[in-house]
Amino acid sequence: GSVSVHPKARGEGHMKRLLGDWITDLEGTCDLLALDGQRQRYAYFGFTPGSEKYTFYLDVANVRHTWKNGELSAYTFAPLFPENGEADEEAAAFAKKLNEEKPLYVVREDVKACLKTFGEQAIAIWKNGERIGYLALCGGNQVVEAEVLEEQDFVPALAAYLKENALDSLFISIPVYETGKAAALSEVCESFTKERCGSAMYRIFQFADVIEAMLTMKAETMGISDGTWSAVLEGQPVTVTVKDG
């Protein structure tokens, strides 16, 4: 959701009250809060910028020189949600399953809404007549999310989408811990950047819990060096020990 104040009511403290009440309600039940917003505005409420992602640049020349004529013809595309009640429910269940197979995911109560918010297009990926994945597209050529049943289809499917739609390029964003996707994209794409995920801001209530969760995920996906580290974070003493990471 969003927090908005009418222009005529600015300066009256409404946002401060709303955010303050929200944080008070959640502090006892959450370890971490996340939102998108302007840095200084949310710094007042204890939020700090964070996150990382890779954005790969795939252009038509990369595709032309990597795949010969006909090699991408097995892939076809259609709207993931055909605006048919039963079919939409089945598509949402398919996308939900793929999402929840990722090493780190957010539980989505309404998959269709999540994949169509902020002007996104949800596109189903088909291979030889079988649905194998989906992609979420913004602005015509920005892939903000893409999932497939078999990782070997990830890059060819994106290349096929570029070719089928006569696009000059695609910008493909992935989390840094999805190392298999990153390796496959880096073999084909023209370039990449490493950057923050939009305007992501975070407030941590329980540092030990958040650090344990994040380091566990990193150890499982990217690997981590052994060692011990101690600090006092906003009054919370924390010691981290990694062994056989």
Q: Which ranges hold each PLM region?
A:
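Amide-forming acyltransferase catalytic core, primarily the GNAT-like/NAT-type
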Residues: P49-K163, D209-G223
